[in-house]
Amino acid sequence: MKQIDSEDSITVPNDTPEDNSASSMQPVMSNLSIEEHQSENEPIEQEQADAKDPLLSKYHLACQQGDLATVKEIIENGVIDLKHDYDDVERVSGLHWASINNRLSVVRYLISKDVDVNFQGGELNATPLHWAARYGYVYIVDYLLEHGADPSVTDAQGFNLLHLSINSSNIMLVIYVLFFVIDDKLDIDCVDPNGRTALLWAAYQGDSLSVETLLKFRASVKATDKGGFTPLHWGTVKGQAQVLKHLIENGADFFQKTADGKNCFAIAHDMNTTGSLVGALYQCGFNKEGFAIPVYFKKSLHTKLVTFFAPWIFIGVLFKCFASIHPIFSLIFSILLGLGMRYTLKKYVIPAYAQRNTRQSFLKTPFLAGVFSGSVFWASYTWLTRIMPLTLIEEPITNLLFFAGVVLLASLFVKLVRSDPGLIPEETDHSKVKETIKELLNVGKFDAKHFCISTWVRKPIRSKFSNFSRALVTRFDHFCPWIYNDIGLRNHKTFLFFILCLETCIFVFLKLCMEYFDVLEDTFEDDYDLNCGIFGEDLCAGFFFDTFTFLVLAWTCFQGIWVGFLTFVQLFQTAKGVTNYEFSTLSKRRHNHDSSVNEYFTTTPLELIDEEEADPLNPVIPGNNPRDPLMQKSRTCFGICWTLTGLDQFVMVIKETFGVAQREEPRNNILSFKISTDYGWRTNLKDFWLTSDITAPTWQRFLYSPSCSKALLNGEEVDYFKLYKLPERHYLAEEIV
């Protein structure tokens, strides 16, 4: 952040939300060095120095830059009277300047000298609390409130602490104010002179995080300003779909009219935000006219079962169709059948339990889990009815192995679908949330990196909030649509057993099919002269004499290819002691050169910044660099398939491991970035494959997954629910891979 040298930079008109759009900026950092501040702002400082007392200018400059030594020298020498440390024209005190520049040490010192924390000055007649809140400086706000600052005081625009917190768009400050100020000193629906509540301002700014949090504290969606606008009306003006969705879900009336007789549909038409409004309506169960979409199933379980079993039927019909009629007609029929099934599911089935009108919604349903299980079903059916009767005598062990593999595979699949990936429960006790916030403030870690803004708990290292599970997942790896669940600490090992078992079953099935086709060739070789070009005689016999089984084999082998890539990636990342999510984030972070994005809403003062914050395991989420191919999420059909099969991760591993992504840079390590949880391959594998219960037999530690939140990390037992610091690394050089 640039140092603030003039109140003009924070002046906000008091007319309409349009005039106040400048105040809805993202939180900004104020951790530049003094030298940077001096070079950037020297002309303004000199102009100010010419206009007022040089000693006062020096004092204010020291407050702005956090030069505590100079501030102490001036105060203790009696050069400045703290009861009058401002210019009579500007009326901006040293505490104002220290507050708006996030200089906590100066703020502490000035308050220790009994300055007036509620002194109102500047063009807006605002207090230091207002100045700090406008820029989202939660540490300054906390300290000022603890030392007597009054949150109910309003500035010349009629804004109090809550309004200015919303204007800052810093969700961390909003959460702090809601927990520590609202109800006791402020009403959540308090209004400014134009009748606008905090929720109305957040909706206009398109700040979905603040809107969601305000609604959790029961902010009114029915409140109207002097123009008759509700939060939904102003949200429609902005056109942020998530904001509209949150408001509609909480009972906002989209038919309600403003004072000039316009409802949300008319406003959306005028502001060209109809697409956002219609999308939000569909996600909340309404059509584009605002009427409820009919639901044809009473229980979501029933609709999920329909979605799950639909691919079973489709795959069987598809194989039978291609095995029975001409390929051209089969292709046309299959496309029509697929489109019809997709339309039916999205219109009549999925709306009963999933969000609508989003490209990713279909992937967050049991459909792909049904595709996998349906594939296993038809492979098993083919084996049981066609392959086994003709190969049991020749290959009894192989048939028994396939049967055992399918049973184990089905058991692991059911276990994974029903498993707990390691969910950290949401904290509902507000007193405990307050304790957590204060604890993080004291150590300089109250930001979205260390505090979950959705579940209100301190975020352990290696955890991530899952939109699917709506909870924090410990040692989060990825969401797997093929098992309809997240993969985390408590089911990651089971998942690896699952894909290893699946790959083994595919190879065994291939061997049995080739033996079966050989039997068919021997049976019919005297009656037919087969010629299939590049295919061998066995495959040719299978294609001609049992096309259905041939197609099942082809589909199964295709699955085996991408599962093989997935297995390689998982085993590689396990040996490196990193999860899929961590590896992807680290790779993207290396390619991201935009350091201006503050995705974690960090406003930690310099005095509280910890060196551990340089830990690359929890990096700042990359910004949007359209020229960086690794930063782009493909929205094409091919791109989605590429992601679903895990081939994108395989390519990323190859690039980062062998330097394909960055050939121009000299590299001494096997990876182009440091992994904080890589303790050497032996230790990493032990941490992953063995539970932390050293009293249990080794076989049990290997086969069982963690039953609680405790697991090994660097050979030590750690509680992943409370993992806030990584164990120190100590591994041998020969262990590095």
From Swiss-Prot:
Q: Where are the ANK repeats?
A: 54-84, 90-119, 124-153, 157-190, 194-223, 227-256
Q: Which residues lie on this side of the membrane: Lumenal?
A: 386-396, 515-547
User: Which InterPro entries does the annotation name?
Assistant: Ankyrin_rpt, Ankyrin_rpt-contain_sf, Palmitoyltrfase_DHHC
Task: Look up the domain of life of the source.
Answer: Eukaryota
Q: What is the role of the protein in this entry?
A: Palmitoyltransferase specific for casein kinase 1.
Q: Which family does it belong to?
A: Belongs to the DHHC palmitoyltransferase family. AKR/ZDHHC17 subfamily.
- Protein name, per record: Palmitoyltransferase AKR1
Upper lineage is: Eukaryota, Fungi, Dikarya, Ascomycota, Saccharomycotina
Q: Which gene underlies this protein?
A: AKR1
